[in-house]
Amino acid sequence: MRRSLSLAILSQVPRSLVEVVVSWNLPMHRWLKVYVFKQSRSRLGPGAAVMLTYLASTVLHGLTGQIAAVLFSLGAYTWVEHSLRAKLSNIMDASIGARREAEPRKRVGSITDHLMKTVNIILMSQHREGSSWVILVNLVFGLVTMFHLAYLGVMFDQSSPDQATGYSWAHTMSKWRDLDYTSHWAMGILATVNWLL
């Protein structure tokens, strides 16, 4: 059985930053998930485990200011995006999570959940992958993802001789300052919405 190193289409036309991070380098993702994330999640909690995983990834990719800034930004971005989309998916009972669902979700619990399930049975076609509003929401999140990737990708200027060894932290911050930290502000807004939900 041949295993892929990456799933290029999911990196080039992404649904979410989570999907990009997972599909960019499958062997490294599997290793980091098994040996860093899962090992630390029970002791530190999911948020700290995500950041520890990105720290390990930074070390494996070469500890430069440029790589560290981009990967730690990705860590924060993916955590916020995953959390926000999970909350929205649960509230709307829709397939708008950061990763595609293998099968429809099953809701259990209180009478309110039972009533929501009844309403959702009536409106089921509106909540699945193929419905127009779910496609629209996922498309908007996909466009936001492409914006973040372009912003983070500005750090990797192939025309400079310094790129081979990696830029310093100060250089990376000056590039982002020139862009008014636009992507970081956008993620801050999403983090606030996530916190309010």
Regions found by a protein language model. Name each.
Residues 1-197:
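Non-catalytic, membrane-anchoring transmembrane segments at the edges
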